[in-house]
A protein has these predicted regions:
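Gram-negative bacterial Sec-dependent N-terminal signal peptides
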Residues: 1-41
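Extracellular beta-rich repeat passengers
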Residues: 43-78, 90-100, 105-106, 110-260, ...
Length: 374
């Protein structure tokens, strides 16, 4: 496997002066506009075992995820306003299917999930004083798995039509044993309720496990429409910002900037909506995946096999999207069996194309685009 840099180098040139300076100042502007500022916490609490009973994390502590931590089925994790989770390399949080998470941040007291290296730059423990750094991959991510319909054809026993028995293993997670159910998502409940996220900032995270096997900033697998996500920020993630696999979950008020691959990635039949977004793509001299270069702003895919259902029929509203000028990267990339609508969105500074059709499986994505089906 090719080695992956943990740094996020950025090119300096007049062409990218606006984006470069926007990146430098976006910690302040983005967090202020979204209300993502707040007070720091006190003593550190190491978290080294899975969460098997309902648990509350308070803003009087900081929490250090030591390894891959699961919220197990039947358990609920509640995170109070103003709580800071500051982890070492390798720390990540995954909410298994059948568990719930409630991130109860507010405009004045957001929940911050970041690295200990980030917190070390805070003066007096105040996150408003943090220094933006050209870095990523300093901890893992937040993954939430649910019970909604997905279209996934590589799992033995899955079928081509929507089925409650279809499931998949979540990208980037490690099984404790073969067939570990805690890494699985998908089912037959499009009203799945895996909890809620309100005012959450995810910073300096992500992990490239292997080719096409990464931890995104926020990974959502098979979540239903009863799951609520409102006001979330992803900054400096080494892979995608947000990736959604199937389900019907909706999102409002999202900010994604300076990530190493796609900002907003969709797969396996997502049928939800996203509204009020800001995307600023990462830019680097090194165009390899996971190095800090942004790929597509939006990448939309359906089933891995285009005969499989449900297809991706999502909608994006009121997004401002700033790309980066690397050839081969698109403001929107369309792959097989994805039919996404964009309403009242502004796209600027794209790479090769504003709309790019990737006919990877040879089953007509380009044709669907040109004949108006999409």
């Amino acid at each position: 496997m090719e080695s992956v840099s943990t740094q996020v180098p950025r090119k300096t040139s007049p062409k990218n002066f606006l984006v470069k300076n926007l990146i430098k100042g976006i910690t302040a502007t983005s967090l202020v506009s979204m209300g993502l500022v707040g007070a720091a916490s006190a003593g550190e609490v190491p978290v080294s075992i899975n969460i098997a009973t309902s648990t509350t994390w308070t803003n009087t502590n900081t929490y250090n995820l030591q390894g891959q931590i699961f919220v197990l089925p039947g358990a609920t994790l509640t995170i109070e306003p103003g709580t800071v989770i500051a982890s070492d390399v390798g720390g990540s949080l995954a909410v298994s299917k059948g568990a719930q998470i409630f991130v109860n941040g507010t405009q004045n007291q957001p929940v911050i999930m970041t690295s200990k290296a980030d917190v070390a730059t805070w003066i007096g423990g105040d996150p408003k004083t943090g220094t933006w750094r050209e870095s990523a991959n300093e901890w893992g991510n937040l993954t939430i798995m649910g019970d909604a319909f997905i279209s996934e054809d590589s799992t033995p026993g899955n079928v081509a039509t929507p089925s409650a028995s279809n499931f998949a293993a979540m990208e980037g997670l490690t099984e404790a044993f073969p067939g570990d159910p805690n890494v699985l998502y998908g089912g037959g409940n499009d009203d799945d309720d895996s909890g809620s996220i309100n005012y959450l900032s995810l910073r300096y995270g992500g992990k490239v496990v292997s080719l096409a096997n990464e931890l995104n900033g926020l990974s959502l697998g098979g979540l239903g429409r009863a799951t609520d996500i409102d006001h979330v920020e992803i900054m400096n993630n080494v892979d995608d910002g947000i990736e959604i696999w199937g389900g019907t979950v909706n999102l409002k008020h999202f900010s994604i900037w300076n990530v190493g691959d796609d900002s907003f990635d969709v797969d396996q039949g997502w049928r939800g909506k996203a509204q009020f977004g800001l995307i600023v793509q990462g830019y680097s001299l090194n165009a390899s995946q996971g190095s800090g270069v942004g790929d597509n702003c939006f990448e939309t895919d359906g089933a891995e096999d285009s005969d499989w259902q449900p297809v991706t029929t999502a909608a994006i509203y009121n997004a401002t999207v700033i790309g980066q000028p690397i050839d081969g990267d698109g403001l929107t990339a369309w792959r097989d069996n994805a039919r996404v609508q964009y309403h009242n969105c502004v796209f600027v500074d794209g790479g090769e194309k504003a709309v790019r059709f990737d006919d990877l499986d040879g089953d007509g994505a380009q044709g669907y685009g040109h004949n108006g089906t999409l």
